Amino acid sequence: IHGDNKTRKGERKLHEERWQAASAAAHQHLSTPQTAAGGGRVLREVTLEMPIRYAPSDAVEKWLNNLLCLDCGSTPNRIIGGTPHPRECELYYVDRDSLFSYHKLSESFLQRIMALYVASHYKNQPNDLQLLSDAPAHHIFVLLGPQAEGQGNAGQLPDVLCVVQVALEGEISKESVAAQLSRGQRASGDLIPWTVAQQFQDNEFAGLSGARVVRIATHPDVTGMGYGSRAVELLTKYYQGELASGEFEEENEAAKPADEESDDESNLLKEKVKPRKALPPLLLPLTDRPAERLHWFGTSFGLTLQLYTFWQRSGFRSVYIRQTANPLTGEHTAIMLNALKCDDLPASPAAGWLDEFVGDARKRFMALLAYEF
């Protein structure tokens, strides 16, 4: 959703035009007799190309950049399968064991995902890659076109139209919430539950289960074509149990690969790191994976008109806007929620529970318009 490849190309072209104009003006200024005698200013552009940590063409630097996806580039692979209608595209779950197996195709697919993050102006660090690889609550979904299966059968990687990173949050006990809020503290993680509980002094919301969109990035060649909205729509249906049959259950022993050792037999001191013999499929249709049933679907982002409009069109409603702006971006952090259909869940909240948060947040925002916003 964020970022536009055409905009970046335009910025580079504008920089080159300004540089050429400034250089021509400087040469003309120096060529005149009046300025040539008295001296003049010379315009120079300095570019740093010498590595500051490694020697030139050091193999360790190349290996490290590939391992941490630091050199995936800001321009993703070109889309070769065309631009299908969003309604023809489907969302797939990415198995992280296969994604981070360092298999040749899996590694190329990971590089494509990280390239989309870079193109969408997300700040990527090695810690973000580690969080993506082994954080239990994080999941990755990709939106693919109808030709994805044909590309896979031909041994080609499918075109990634949109990638969504989701973190499961909530299900915090009332006792833990009350104890943390009474001390003016909050545990790490669970951004939306803790923020809402702290702002509204509500211990009930933190006990609900939900999912937060950590990152969502659309391929820069197809921004504004509805692929991001399609991905959010399918995720909403998925977490409402409308796409997959059954509910999510932890993997049992029978579901483990044959080469995976049990917890009793494994020992970190004796474990031998080796390639796995059997890997699960990299991409799994949502219809083949039971969903985690949730009460809400949310997002937190730096507030802009474009992003607010996007999430509002997807059925999300604003419940929190931070009073102070981010010192780096100058944007106010916003939280928007979408109440999912969860009447069949045992601990489902009363109907219209989100309306109370939205109404209270709107009153606060109106009262602070003359001050902070």
Swiss-Prot record:
Keyword Iron-sulfur: no
Ranges annotated as spanning the membrane: none
Binding site for acetyl-CoA: 216-218, 223-229, 313
Chain sites annotated for binding ATP: 53
InterPro entries for the chain: GNAT_dom, NAT10/TcmA_helicase, TmcA/NAT10/Kre33
Biological process annotations from GO: rRNA acetylation involved in maturation of SSU-rRNA; tRNA processing
Primary localisation category: nucleus
Keywords assigned: Acyltransferase, ATP-binding, Nucleotide-binding, Nucleus, rRNA processing, Transferase, tRNA processing
GO cellular component: 90S preribosome; nucleolus
Recorded catalytic activity of this chain's protein: a cytidine in 18S rRNA + acetyl-CoA + ATP + H2O = an N(4)-acetylcytidine in 18S rRNA + ADP + phosphate + CoA + H(+); a cytidine in tRNA + acetyl-CoA + ATP + H2O = an N(4)-acetylcytidine in tRNA + ADP + phosphate + CoA + H(+)
A Pfam family this chain is assigned to: NAT10_TcmA_helicase
UniProt-listed Enzyme Commission number(s): 2.3.1.-
Intracellular or extracellular location(s): Nucleus, Nucleolus
Class of enzymatic activity (EC top level): transferase
GO molecular function: 18S rRNA cytidine N-acetyltransferase activity; ATP binding; tRNA binding; tRNA N4-acetyltransferase activity
Ranges for region Disordered: 246-271
Function according to Swiss-Prot or TrEMBL: RNA cytidine acetyltransferase with specificity toward both 18S rRNA and tRNAs. Catalyzes the formation of N(4)-acetylcytidine (ac4C) in 18S rRNA. Required for early nucleolar cleavages of precursor rRNA at sites A0, A1 and A2 during 18S rRNA synthesis. Catalyzes the formation of ac4C in serine and leucine tRNAs. Requires a tRNA-binding adapter protein for full tRNA acetyltransferase activity but not for 18S rRNA acetylation.
Protein family according to the UniProt entry: Belongs to the RNA cytidine acetyltransferase family. NAT10 subfamily.
Listed name of the protein: RNA cytidine acetyltransferase
Species this chain originates from: Achlya ambisexualis (Water mold)
